[in-house]
Amino acid sequence: MGLQLLTDRVRRVRRDNAEHRLSWLLRSRRLKGHRFHRQRAIGPFVVDFICVERALIIELVGAQHVLGLGPDAQRKQFLESLGYEVIRVWDSEVLSDPRAVLKKVLAHF
């Protein structure tokens, strides 16, 4: 197995773990009674988490992303043009300090 393939696999597993953990933190209306959906399509994009009633999207960001550049900026601009607020959270932050992530999300309510 090539180094790049192995690196990609590690990133994918880490992202999956972070996504699963965040899903667990957001489930059962734990954040002020608001419901979050996971992996929902909006236009040509699939967002990680969305609270429809608050028009709030949470996107997990891995080390492979560069904030504010390329397709991520276009994606965010598109979602904001539809009235959504987009919060970007590093997957490493979800895994290392989930309480800080919840505080960050709660600040938008």
Where are the regions a protein language model picked out?
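Solvent-exposed, charged helical/coil patches
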Residues: M1-R35, S81, F109
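Basic, amphipathic alpha-helical patches used to engage nucleic acids or provide basic targeting signals
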Residues: R11-R15, G43-H108
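Short secondary-structure junction/hinge motifs that connect adjacent elements
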Residues: S23, Q39-P44
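Residue-level signal for inorganic ion chemistry
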Residues: L26, R40, V89
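Short secondary-structure boundary/capping segments within folded domains
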Residues: S28, Q39, D48-I50
